[in-house]
Swiss-Prot record:
Organism name: Shewanella amazonensis (strain ATCC BAA-1098 / SB2B)
GO process terms (BP): rRNA base methylation
Name used for this protein in its record: Ribosomal RNA large subunit methyltransferase F
InterPro entries in alphabetical order: METTL16/RlmF (IPR010286), rRNA_lsu_MeTfrase_F (IPR016909), SAM-dependent_MTases_sf (IPR029063)
Reactions that this protein is recorded to catalyse: adenosine(1618) in 23S rRNA + S-adenosyl-L-methionine = N(6)-methyladenosine(1618) in 23S rRNA + S-adenosyl-L-homocysteine + H(+)
NCBIfam families: PRK11727.1
Functional summary from the UniProt entry: Specifically methylates the adenine in position 1618 of 23S rRNA.
């Protein structure tokens, strides 16, 4: 039997207008920098009026973006202490919480998911999905990663926020070729998994991507970005190897996740992942059909000019 496929869209989107963030996203209307500075004074030195007279920060400065994240997490989510080591991925909070809002909409429509934990695949040193799921939605979360340094940093964050330490558990994936296998337990079940796959196929490709983003930011400020030997490629999103690339890139990772989910069909009520490259949707849908998925959904999200998608699927229970 062919899987049931649906694309979750809004009336606003169907009319060709920008969809924008989820209606419940606290950051839908931008940032209240005055309130954020009051909650986190270290943000103040980075805040200034932009060309339009609005308060903002320079998003090309890693220190500024990290201070903004600290303020957002403290002001909106009660996470009093958050930090990442230099060079690790600094995630955009509005986009990350948008994923979780859409996921919670899906879970509310799905019987049998109340009280089940989430599985955060590749939590990274920032642990952002686990932290937001626990603080904003009250979910228990199992967070996994292939990098011990990332898990060590998340453990430090949890110790600084005792309320979250009780809801989030960390697991090391010892085999980097595995995603679900070996890091989950027999008869364990999750409401859903969340995942932000590595985007690039190699370290060189990741470096080129960073340079393009640097040039884009410089252009938006009317400046010229100079690259080459001796020019450090730093940017607020940073990222270590495991956070930015894997062999075969995003498509290869997604297909491996689909294959493993088919071997563990009852592990999650819904398997979900971000898909950054729209060209990867078709091969993923084809693989899901081949692996016997009973339902497939694509949920579109928009943050500014950037459009991403959540791919969600499930299998008929075999228990």
């Amino acid at each position: 039997m062919a899987p049931f496929f649906s694309a979750m869209t809004s009336k606003k989107q169907s009319q060709g207008l920008p969809k924008g963030p989820h209606p419940d996203n606290a950051h839908r209307d931008g940032y209240d920098f005055s309130a954020l500075v009051a909650s986190h004074p270290p943000l103040k030195p980075f805040v200034r009026a932009n060309a339009y007279g609005n308060l903002s920060i320079d998003f090309a400065l890693p220190e500024a973006v990290k201070a903004l994240n600290c303020a957002l997490l403290k002001h909106h989510y009660g996470i009093s202490r958050w930090d990442i080591p230099k060079g690790f991925l600094c995630p955009p909070i509005p986009g990350r919480v948008d994923y979780l809002h859409h996921l919670e909409d899906l879970l509310r429509q799905t019987p049998g998911t109340d009280g089940l934990p989430l599985l955060d695949i590749g939590t990274g040193a920032n642990g952002i999905y686990a932290l937001l799921a626990a603080s904003r939605f009250g979910r228990a979360v199992v967070a996994t990663d292939i990098a011990k340094a990332s898990l060590t940093n998340v453990a430090t964050i949890l110790k600084a926020n005792p309320g979250l330490e009780k809801r989030i558990s960390l697991r090391f994936q010892s085999n980097p070729r595995h995603i679900l296998t070996g890091v989950t337990q027999t008869n364990e079940q999750f409401a859903a998994c969340v995942c932000n796959p590595p985007f690039h196929a190699s370290a060189a490709e990741a470096a080129l991507g960073t340079n393009r983003k640097l040039e884009g930011l410089a252009k938006s400020r009317g400046q010229r970005h100079i690259s080459g030997p001796g020019k450090p490629q730093t940017l607020n999103f940073g990222g270590q190897d495991a956070e930015l690339w894997c062999d075969g890139g995003e498509r290869s990772f997604l297909l491996r996740l689909i294959d493993e989910s088919a071997r563990l069909p009852d592990l999650c009520v819904w398997f979900t992942t971000l898909v950054s490259k729209s060209d990867n949707l078709r091969p993923c849908k084809r693989r899901l059909e081949q692996r016997g998925a009973s339902e497939i959904k694509v949920i579109e999200m928009q943050q500014g000019q950037k459009i991403t998608r959540i791919l969600a699927w499930r299998f008929e229970s075999v228990t």
